């Protein structure tokens, strides 16, 4: 007979196939709540996918609504703007709740129970990601605090990754990708973003012959995203000041 942990993991897989990600989160939260040993690679990936989909839908909604709000403001439609602001605030409350949920799990259970280099980097990267999502829409002191927490988590992850993971390791590459996006999108620091992305890409290219079959696809995909962002950011920096809609940066697991 399956243990409660095995049953919840099984049901999380079922929920994923049915694309019912809120329930997938609930099943994986039960696994984490009863945690007596570190999550397996399968379990931590399920947790990540569940939260990625739950947060991703709302981040997309927030971007669309913010864009509509800007258009209505430029047209002077004050009544519409007031309604949209209220609607945007509702989505921001949902985003805050989701981010706080996973951040609490990471701080109370997951980071402390991580025993290997790759799991430590995985969870610290995740912590940085969800603080970054908060920084995307928070303002003032809350935004500053979220950005500082993002930077701290990513730097802690980077220190471990550089010491314990190969330059081609997909988790190390994914961290470099998201960290560079944070520099570009949140801190408005294109030079640091480009330097970090280029260094990660160059180090991985130099080591690419050592890639095993199992991680080849994941690693080369992230390397391509790093290169795409470098191309995009370099182009944006050259065109700075041009009045055009800019293509969003690409991040890992988003």
Curated annotation (Swiss-Prot):
Name the domain of life this protein comes from. Answer: Eukaryota
**InterPro entries recorded:** 14-3-3, 14-3-3_CS, 14-3-3_dom_sf, 14-3-3_domain
What SUPFAM superfamilies does the annotation carry?
Answer: 14-3-3 protein
**What Pfam families does the record tag this protein with?**
14-3-3 (PF00244)
Q: In Gene Ontology terms, what is a biological process of this protein?
A: protein localization
Q: Gene Ontology cellular component? A: cytoplasm
What's this protein's family per the entry? Belongs to the 14-3-3 family.
**Name listed for the protein in its UniProt record:** 14-3-3-like protein RA215
Tell me the organism.
Solanum tuberosum
